[in-house]
Amino acid sequence: MGLGAISYGLTFENKPKRIVVTEINDERINRAREVISEEEAAAHGVELIYVNTAAMQDQVKELLELTDGKGYDDVFVYIPNRGVCEMGNSIMAYDGCMNLFAGPTDMKFSSMINLYDCHYSRSKIIGSTGGTIDDMKEAIEKEAKGLIKSAVMITHVGGLDSVVETTKNLPEVPGGKKLVYTHINMPMTAIDDFGKLGESDPFFKELDAVCKKNKGLWSAEAENMLLEHFQ
């Protein structure tokens, strides 16, 4: 969802001047930079900054320095972690809003928040799990026009026969979104595993090549190839 949010943030009408993306893993940062580069963001008029907060001595101080001390108008939290929530609360600008997008499963999940800032700096905290029907329509329309890249979120592809086991074991299945084609039978398969499977299966070898020429992303060409193979 984080990659999808970055892609969306570059395209809406009242777009931000700057987007700062935080991670604690250089490999994931490099992957994000590969599929949504700083240069691509600049072409949309947005300054995009990727930072590894694990390498920071003082995370709050250094993140605020990226805004010249002003703070962030909007903070999105994509993990239900107390420390991350408290850090997000600490870097909001005046009249800022923090959105806890990651849904916690612990009914007692809580963290410390600055109620002084809530009163005097008009800071706000909200939680959301998705959008309205109109939001979905907008996303589909933008995807159809090529304005956003929903493919950056897809890491696995499978058929209808893979749904039950994938759903039951979702916490143990790494990666992002799992794309299901309901009219074919195919195990839920990671796009990154196509190359290994291609060592013994010519179809996956070709499918891997199609994805790799698209920065490792699923595409219309890959989809057409899959559907033709399983028809």
Question: Where are the regions a protein language model picked out?
Answer:
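Mid-domain Rossmann-like dinucleotide-binding core that forms the NAD(H)/NADP(H) cofactor-binding site
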Residues: M1-A54
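Conserved helix-to-beta-strand junction in the class I
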Residues: F12, S90-Y94, F101
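Glycine-centered, small-residue-biased loops immediately flanking beta-strands
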Residues: K17, G96-C97
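Short, acidic/turn-prone active-site loops that include or flank metal/cofactor-
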Residues: N25, A102-D106, G130
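C-terminal hydrophobic helical "lid"/dimerization subdomain
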Residues: R31-A43, A54-E65, K70, G83-S90, ...
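N-terminal Rossmann-like NAD(P) cofactor-binding module of classical short-chain dehydrogenase/reductase
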Residues: D73-F76
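Rossmann-fold NAD(P)-binding glycine/threonine-rich loop
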Residues: R82-E86, S90, A102-R122, M136-E138
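Active-site capping/gating segments
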Residues: K124-K142
